[in-house]
């Protein structure tokens, strides 16, 4: 089975800041798309996925501070308790930077398992802040979306690595 992840012998080009900013914008807009019923249960936090991807792939370009501001941006757009996404995204970014080398050693599907843990922790942190703020506990289906996000991880990684790949790969096998 072919692997679409960056191979060890392949050197990726650095990501362009404009490309990173556009992917952040698309993640933000994807979070704002309305979903109802079962689709709402399956909808992952796209902005968290993009933040996680860039913190793992380009840690010098995306860090805890940028994740914090993206979280504040999400809080304002969601009209939720101010700071809940900011805290969760900042902790997610720190965790991604901490486990970065470990995650990069795995294939995309093994990375997805690691990403699932990070996304579940992020969702639990948002839930904790909501509950402390007085919101009722959601149903168990609240934790389905982070698992769907982990399943989206390989596709997201392939799509975001495409512009970074060299034009012609002349690697001898």
Enumerate the predicted regions with their spans.
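Terminal, non-globular segments
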Residues: 1-173
């Amino acid at each position: 089975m072919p692997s679409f992840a960056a191979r060890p012998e392949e050197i990726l080009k650095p990501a362009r800041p404009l490309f990173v900013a556009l992917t952040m914008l698309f993640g933000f807009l994807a979070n704002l798309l309305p979903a109802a019923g079962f689709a709402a249960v399956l909808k992952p936090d796209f902005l968290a996925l993009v933040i996680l991807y860039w913190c793992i792939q380009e840690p010098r370009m995306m860090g805890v501070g940028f994740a914090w501001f993206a979280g504040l941006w999400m809080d304002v757009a969601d009209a939720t308790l101010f700071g809940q996404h900011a805290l969760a995204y900042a902790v997610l970014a720190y965790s991604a930077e901490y486990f970065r080398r470990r995650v990069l050693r795995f294939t995309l599907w093994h990375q997805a398992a690691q990403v699932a843990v990070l996304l579940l922790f992020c969702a639990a942190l948002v839930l904790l802040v909501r509950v402390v703020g007085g919101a009722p506990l959601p149903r168990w289906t609240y934790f389905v979306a982070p698992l769907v996000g982990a399943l989206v991880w390989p596709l997201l990684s392939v799509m975001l690595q495409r512009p970074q790949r060299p034009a012609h790969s002349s690697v001898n096998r």
